[in-house]
From Swiss-Prot:
Catalytic activity from the UniProt record: a quinone + NADH + 5 H(+)(in) = a quinol + NAD(+) + 4 H(+)(out)
Lineage of the organism: Bacteria, Pseudomonadati, Pseudomonadota, Betaproteobacteria, Neisseriales
Enzyme class: translocase
Assembly, per entry: NDH-1 is composed of 14 different subunits. Subunits NuoB, C, D, E, F, and G constitute the peripheral sector of the complex.
PROSITE patterns to which the protein is assigned, alphabetical: COMPLEX1_20K
Gene Ontology CC terms, in alphabetical order: plasma membrane; respiratory chain complex I
Residues that bind [4Fe-4S] cluster: 37-38, 102, 132
One annotated GO molecular function: 4 iron, 4 sulfur cluster binding
Cofactor(s) needed by this chain: [4Fe-4S] cluster
Swiss-Prot/TrEMBL GO biological process terms: aerobic respiration; electron transport coupled proton transport
Free-text remark on how the cofactor is bound: Binds 1 [4Fe-4S] cluster.
Role description: NDH-1 shuttles electrons from NADH, via FMN and iron-sulfur (Fe-S) centers, to quinones in the respiratory chain. Couples the redox reaction to proton translocation (for every two electrons transferred, four hydrogen ions are translocated across the cytoplasmic membrane), and thus conserves the redox energy in a proton gradient.
Name the record gives this protein: NADH-quinone oxidoreductase subunit B
Amino acid sequence: MGIEGVLKKGFITTSADTVLNHMRTGSLWPVTFGLACCAVEMMHAGMARYDLDRFGIIFRPSPRQADLMIVAGTLTNKMAPALRRVYDQLAEPRWVLSMGSCANGGGYYHYSYSVVRGADRVVPVDVYVPGCPPTAEALIYGLIQLQQKIKRTSTIARDE
């Protein structure tokens, strides 16, 4: 947990940032935004073989109950406003994971007139998971990278 010092008599000293970030990494609640074949791999990651619950990751049906959005698949121009609307409904602090080549940069359909060339043109993306489609292991690795990123962030504002 990043303990800075241990005092005598059983007291532990640490920063509030460390405690808050530790709690946030152990309770990511993603809402799924499955648009194409990558969504099937996302479903595999939630099933018994990979079991995202062991990381504290529980899929939520509503964006108002979630703090992470997993964008999986080809994002079209018609779907971009809906993606932004779902992102705006996420609870703060919120994170976005872009899953698959199509969500990362348009993928196979990059030159199509109707495809957005990356989810990062609509919402800020924190972690990119490459692949077409990426495996469930790759998604889990991306989620672990997001947890590491959350642990490194400053939560409480400091006067400098």
